[in-house]
Amino acid sequence: MKKRRSKKERQELLQQTIETNPFITDEDLAEKFQVSIQTVRLDRMELSIPELRERIKHVATKQHEEDVKSLPLEEVVGEIIDIELDRHAISIFEVKVEHVFKRNQIARGHHLFAQANSLAVAVIDEELALTAKSTIRYIRPVKLGERVVAKARVEDVENGKGRTVVKVRSFVGEELVFTGTFEMYRSSNYSEEGNNL
C-alpha cells in the first residue's frame, strides 16, 4: 500500500509541478496527486498560486505584438504566450464548440494544423514567411474543452534549399497529439533568389 504524502510534501510538489508546467489544469493536478480538485484549489490558495487563466495571462504579459514580424497576432491561431524569433515559440488553443464535429465532439484537424502552421510562420524573423512544405501527423483526436499547447522550435535556419525548418509538437496536458515539420520560405530568400518558392 502506497503511503499518502503529507500536506507540506504535496504542496511542495504541486508548486514545483506548476512552475515546470504553468498550463496544467487543477483537474490534471488532482489526478496526478490523487486528491480532490477542491484540495488542489485550497493548496493553490494557501501557496498564493493563481488559477490557470491568471497563470496564462501572467506568462503572456510579455508584449508579443512587437516581436512577431511575419503576420499580425490576430492571424495566429491560438494565443502566443512565448516567442523568441528564429528559435522557439509556444501557443495555446482552446477547443470550443465551433472547432469540433457536432456528431462526436472531436476537433476538426485543420484547426490543429492551423495552430501549428501559424506558429511556424510567427517564429520566423522576417517580414514575409510562407510555408513551402509540411509533413504532419495526427497522433490522437482532440476533444471539445481540451487545451492544446503547441511548441515550435527552429531546427535549421538555412537548410540546403535555402529554407528554414520549424518543428512543432502539440500537447494536451503532457500527451503528444500532433507533430509537424514545416519548411518555411523567408522573404530574405525572395530578394536573393527572385520569385522562386
Swiss-Prot record:
Lipid metabolism as a keyword?
yes
Query: Key word Transcription present in the record?
Result: yes
Q: Which domain of life is it from?
A: Bacteria
Which GO-annotated molecular functions does the record name?
Answer: DNA binding; DNA-binding transcription factor activity
Family annotation (SUPFAM superfamilies)? Thioesterase/thiol ester dehydrase-isomerase (SSF54637), Winged helix' DNA-binding domain (SSF46785)
Q: Give the Pfam families listed for this entry.
A: 4HBT
UniProt-listed GO biological process terms = fatty acid biosynthetic process; negative regulation of DNA-templated transcription; negative regulation of fatty acid biosynthetic process
Q: Which UniProt keywords apply?
A: DNA-binding, Fatty acid biosynthesis, Fatty acid metabolism, Lipid biosynthesis, Lipid metabolism, Repressor, Transcription, Transcription regulation
Family the UniProt entry places it in:
Belongs to the FapR family.
Q: What does this protein do?
A: Transcriptional factor involved in regulation of membrane lipid biosynthesis by repressing genes involved in fatty acid and phospholipid metabolism.
Its recorded name reads: Transcription factor FapR
Recorded source organism is Bacillus cereus (strain 03BB102)
Which lineage? Bacteria, Bacillati, Bacillota, Bacilli, Bacillales
